[in-house]
């Protein structure tokens, strides 16, 4: 404190910056070294393990009021968060549907946090990079240059963006001004009975309600039945509803089924409906040379939701919404209060990216995607997608070759459902396979999930993992059989 401050009774000014930059630089080197080791040795650790009580108890500690040395803070993080992860970066994590991250993307997230830009808008390099990554997503899916898009938290939000534009375009009234109560005829949205639960949330958030989303039956391959969809549209019009939007699945969450996107695009055009594609699982198959044909027609969509944090393996979180009609996209979200007006030059002369979504403050999500794409090139990511799809076919072959394993159906892309079947049925069979799944997790062998397909209970493997190898799948098949026999012998289930 200088003499003037002291004489005025002023407190010394503080900052969150380190008091010793050399010391924090050396400590940061240690953290980076630990991070490299953490990834390099990922295969040597269990996929997942249960936290002991003393670890859980640490997260009930009260709010800290006084300082703690950074080394102590980092030590606590190492013993807790880093030691008990979800496990999705592990080569044998196939539960739910998650990417496995990548080191370059992690560096991008670190640099984005250091640089600290707010991507709500403005004239700065991060904003331009955000736009460039959106443009790259358009190129990957064959969208026109004139289309727009926005990076968001993930697939659920990307779907909400697309469906909000669809609602406003098809409402026939100014929904932003008058609300959904001003819509003359109730809107109808359509998707298959395999549609992701986020679409229900979207309907509720948009004020339309769950009943506005009509679930259409699927065929034997769990793809939307086009004839049933057409009949539902006719029926709804006759009943006084206004068909507004059809949602096509580029990969369903249960089995990876891909709707006939070309047929849906044609039907939507003929019926005057908005065509939205939920591509959070499979849109990026468009860059995979051996499998791109599976999502043909996605380039005709009015809007698409996709997830770079899945098959581009970006660190969580980053999704992307693309909208063909850029003007409609901006009309749906743009607000220009006096404190966010553009200027002819200076910081506020750049585009306001918040005009394309719900967030005003936005994190710098683009950098982790940009760096990984620049380092590896999009062709490598396409090959990795083909690799995962081939690995699932390999696993399906192992399942078919083992008499005690049963395959639900031939896989479409990178998801396979199967179960251990020693001659049980109903709840006993479900209990056995659930126990197999839990022991695989608890013993740190592999992370699987389970689901219901055609009314039956199945184990589910979703390979969105650039670290998975065929040896891992050999191990999985062996361990499922071993555990199935072990549990049956122990008498934990009965027919």
Labelled PLM ranges:
Residues 453-495:
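PLP-dependent enzyme catalytic core of the Aspartate aminotransferase-like
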Residues 125, 158-330:
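Conserved PLP-enzyme active-site core in the AAT-like
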Residues 296-403:
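Active-site C-terminal subdomain of aminotransferase-like
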Residues 406-411, 448-453:
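Short beta-strand
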Residues 194-196, 220-221, 251-253, 282, ...:
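Short, glycine-/Ser/Thr-/acidic-enriched flexible segments
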Residues 2-3, 7-146, 438-446, 468, ...:
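N-terminal entrance/gating region of PLP-dependent enzymes' catalytic architecture
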Residues 137-165, 214-217:
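Short loop-beta-helix segment that forms the pyridoxal 5′-phosphate
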Residues 407-440:
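Conserved PLP-binding catalytic core of the aspartate aminotransferase-like
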